[in-house]
């Protein structure tokens, strides 16, 4: 079986990407590193996101304007939908994610990249950074009602993030394999991804 240099795993918040990535890492004997979007975010000082990783972000200020702010985009009376607005400090960080993953791969470390493609620029960054590498792209989907139920149950996410990302993250790149965590168990999702690797020419 020809294992890829990078598993590029993309999906909305609360879709089960991290569970899938850790499951893949456990199931594959090769020494894959799991690197996540959130891992990079948490490298920054908390003042730049002030609880944007929690159920309620704190007040916006000059620092969050440079970092990340969770903006409600839905109209009054509609289900809450929230999107992230990245300032210049976080935009530099976001633009550095894929090149950092490339550096790990070039150092001999295959990577399972747990990503959230908020916009087209993030996809283009991956496309450029991973040029010449063997990449298997994995889309992680889930019905919106299940995403939102998970989001509420977790209690560590801004409510509305799942809805805000669900219709966005899958619009930027094609996938080699897609798994629906609303209908498949974590083990079945891992098996589907490994089967996609095995089926490649």
Q: Model-found features: residue ranges?
A:
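P-loop (Walker A) phosphate-binding loop of NTP-binding proteins
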Residues: 12
């Amino acid at each position: 079986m020809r294992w890829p240099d990078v598993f590029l795993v993309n999906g909305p918040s609360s879709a089960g990407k991290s569970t899938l990535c850790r499951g893949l890492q456990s199931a594959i004997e090769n020494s894959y590193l799991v690197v996540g979007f959130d891992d990079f975010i948490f490298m920054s000082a908390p003042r730049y996101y002030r609880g944007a990783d929690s159920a309620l972000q704190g007040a916006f200020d000059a620092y969050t304007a440079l970092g990340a702010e969770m903006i409600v985009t839905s109209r009054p009376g509609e289900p809450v939908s929230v999107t992230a607005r990245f300032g210049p400090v976080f935009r530099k960080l976001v633009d550095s994610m894929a090149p950092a993953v490339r550096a790990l791969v070039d150092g001999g470390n295959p990577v399972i990249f747990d990503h959230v493609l908020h916009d087209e620029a993030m996809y283009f960054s991956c496309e450029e950074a991973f040029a010449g590498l063997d990449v298997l792209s994995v889309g992680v989907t889930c019905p919106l009602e299940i995403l939102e139920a998970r989001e509420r149950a977790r209690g560590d996410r801004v409510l509305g993030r799942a809805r805000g990302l669900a219709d966005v993250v899958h619009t930027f790149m094609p996938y080699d394999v897609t798994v629906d965590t609303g209908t498949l168990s974590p083990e079945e999702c891992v098996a589907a991804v490994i089967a996609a690797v095995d089926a490649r020419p």
